[in-house]
Amino acid sequence: MSGESFGHVETWPGERPPWPGRLWRYTVAVALLAWSAMSALAQTWPFPWPEDRIARYTARRTSSPLVIDGRLDEAAWRAAERSPRFADLIGGGPGIHDTRAAVLWDETYLYVGYWIEEPFVEATLTERDSPIYKNNDVELFIAGRDAYYEFEINAFGTIYEVFFIWEREFESSRYARRPEFDRSRTGVRPFNGVGFRQHPRGPRIGYWNWDLAGLDTAVHVDGTINDNKDRDRGWTAELRIPWRSLEPLAMPDSRALPPRDGDEWRMDFSRFNQYKEAPPAKDSGGWAWSPHGVWDSHIPELFTRVRFSTELVGQK
């Protein structure tokens, strides 16, 4: 396109220029409408993954407590609906190795299971609250209205936990009144996300000194860990979380613990690897049940919607 004025129209001698003003006004009006629509959309949904593509899941009840051994071989786990294969956290393409998760519950506990395909199972970190994300791991985030909990585990069964509170709600949601959330304690520091730093709710306060009371976990390796002379099938991880220990998440909106039939919680299920599928595959090294469109797990609005049903698992 040339650099001529948009309003210039060539005419024959004696003719009036045809509708340049109207054309300009029409074009400006269309542009303003388009800009307004895009602005409204951005204000309505300011997150990097479409709202209509967020995963949904129904968690059903188990009739008896589960033994936490990491094997996931009890009847309830065999009957539980598993997630789809985890997809790339950023792009949404399938991960090179299969990863799935499932959720069960009863009156006392929330149960989460992971099935992790890994041909060469590896782990190095053995000290609790080590940076497990530097190993191949699986992760769970559980969000309340004004806070969320992060959990990570590697193939050794070493765990990492953090509790995050949205700073704007620290006072209004009564966290400031609780000694366990004293901001002067060791291990407390500000946090503003990883790859998505424009979150509309702003920064969080992270409690790296916080442990979820009564948490029980186990892993089972189907192969030989840290021995690449053979090929492994992978590993499984199993979590049991007391409902009463999620009270800090439930506090701001007084949600029921255990949940009532039809209640919804937001949870994120992911896997992070120290390896990637070779190009041209677009493998970020992080896979999730519900992708985020950006390298950041800390976006509760993009967590899987988990609805709790009082229906017993396996009855449908």
Q: What do these predicted ranges mean?
A:
Residues 2-5:
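Serine residues within intrinsically disordered or low-complexity segments
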Residues 10-27:
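Bacterial N-terminal signal peptides that target proteins for export
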Residues 13-15, 31, 278:
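N-terminal compositionally biased or targeting/leader segments
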Residues 26-39:
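Bacterial N-terminal signal peptides
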Residues 43-316:
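Structural preference for beta-rich elements and adjacent junctions enriched in aromatics
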